[in-house]
């Protein structure tokens, strides 16, 4: 019975409206995970999620050059750090004494900050029934249709804010129901093993606001014909 209820909760979460899709904006670099997702620059032309935006200004071109240099240093430093960890691990497996291999990511180098011309405003995509909005531009399929009007831009900002609050509430609601259903028991251990569950640290269910947030009205930027 619990399993059936859990499946129903998962289905409820999946069915919750998700008109917004955030695509993380990163510039594709040689040797990394390339593709057209996020920001890509070629020939001093900026693309976001495969859509051409504009040409970089001279200042942005210099910023891109600085970023490329930092990426090269980052990749070299990361490669060396990984190599050192591998050598330490091999030494431990061979029975040699030495400092234990640290697993904390704090010792690993951090990736350089993205250039200013690749921001979430450029790469966030809002999928509606019939069209997609990115960077305040409406696309039908992969074809640019039009720019949003100033009033529509404001409407989209309000929708994004309310939709984020609403989706956060739905997720917390599901987490709370799952926590109330299974309590502090190790559900998966009891379900699969049938033996004595291991002692685990339980996470308290998130508190929900007294009043549920209202689901925002979806902006009407395009009209599909059925």
UniProtKB/Swiss-Prot annotation:
Signal peptide as annotated in the record: 1-15
Disulfide-linked positions: 131-222
InterPro entries documented for this protein: Pepsin-I3, Pepsin-I3_sf, Protease_Inhibitor_I33
Family annotation (CDD domains): API3
GO MF annotations, alphabetized: aspartic-type endopeptidase inhibitor activity
Subcellular localization(s) per the UniProt record: Secreted
Region feature Disordered, mapped onto this chain: 95-116, 196-218
Disulfide bond keyword on record: yes
GO cellular component terms attached to this protein's record: extracellular region
Keywords: Aspartic protease inhibitor, Disulfide bond, Protease inhibitor, Secreted, Signal
Family as reported in the entry's similarity comment: Belongs to the protease inhibitor I33 family.
Biological function: Aspartyl protease inhibitor.
Protein name per the record: Aspartyl protease inhibitor
Species, as recorded: Parelaphostrongylus tenuis
Lineage: Eukaryota, Metazoa, Ecdysozoa, Nematoda, Chromadorea
């Amino acid at each position: 019975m619990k399993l059936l209820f859990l499946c129903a909760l998962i289905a409820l979460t999946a069915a919750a409206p998700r008109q917004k899709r955030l695509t993380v904006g990163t510039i594709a670099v040689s040797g990394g995970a390339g593709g057209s997702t996020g920001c890509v620059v070629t020939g001093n032309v900026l693309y976001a999620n495969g859509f051409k935006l504009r040409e970089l200004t001279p200042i942005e071109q210099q910023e891109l050059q600085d970023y490329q240099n930092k990426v090269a240093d980052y990749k070299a430093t990361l490669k060396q750090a990984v190599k050192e960890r591998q050598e330490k691990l091999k030494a431990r497996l061979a029975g040699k004494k030495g400092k234990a291999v640290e697993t904390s990511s704090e010792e690993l180098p951090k990736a350089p900050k993205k250039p200013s011309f690749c921001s979430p405003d450029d790469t966030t995509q809002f999928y509606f029934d019939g069209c997609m909005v990115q960077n305040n531009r409406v696309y039908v399929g992969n074809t640019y249709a039009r720019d949003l009007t100033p009033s529509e831009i404001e409407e989209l900002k309000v929708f994004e804010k309310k939709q984020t609050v609403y989706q956060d509430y739905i997720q917390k609601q599901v987490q709370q129901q799952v926590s109330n259903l299974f309590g502090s028991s190790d559900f998966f251990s009891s379900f699969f093993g049938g033996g004595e569950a291991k002692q685990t640290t339980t996470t308290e269910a998130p508190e929900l606001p007294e009043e549920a947030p209202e689901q925002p009205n979806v902006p009407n930027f395009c009209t599909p014909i059925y």
